[in-house]
Amino acid sequence: MQKKAIRSLLWMQALLCAMFLFACSNDDDNSNAPLPKPDPKEVKVQVAADTKTNTATVNVANAPAEASLSLVLDINRGKALDQATADKNGTHTFKLPLLAGYEQKLKLVVKSGGTSAEVNNLTLPAAEEQYTDEQITQGLQGHVWQSVQTRSRILVGHTGTRPYSQFVTQALKRFEFLADSKFTFTVLSPLQKSFPNGTWTVKSKRIDIDTQIPLGPMQLHNTRIQNLTNKELVMLTEVEDGLFLLTFEAQ
């Protein structure tokens, strides 16, 4: 009788151990289960452009709480234009400038819990190219222009081997638009070098610049003026197959 009771007790202990191990296994499975993937059909995006102020808002709703949000140029080698974190309600509002002479095709990248989704086919219209050729010529020749690296950026990366990223965001430089289509490009940092034999032209509101860097010739073509005042010059320019936004201050 005593042996039978002992066997029953051992059997109950074994059963309890098995149940405990099964429960732990389920807990482990749940802890390793991937978080729900953001669903682009559920994320809502509204784009509103104001051509009077040349600004746009991109309103995001229904994203996962505190998800990472990135607005990216939806073309080959396109860079992120802005990044943010959704609030606890999964909402955020981006504010972006419209670019003169350039339509921005964007996608929203939503990342949460190691997974991601995209919302495509977002378009910001091009702003009007407001300056005439004469205004551009007079404005550019009115000052020596020194770069502001912190406000210059790469919008589309180039495929070549030249370090144009350093030209855009690191090199302190000056542009001088002189009479008779003469152009001087001066690098102030990280090295000091002047290239006085360049040329520039303006036609149909677009500027082309032929100059050089220490590695050889460089062309800035199809350049669109974004802002031109007595204090600031902002230009959107193409170098090889890259697209750069360059900001300068008058000296």
Question: Where are each of the predicted segments found?
Answer:
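Residue-level signal for mature regions of secreted extracellular proteins and peptides
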Residues: 17-18, 193
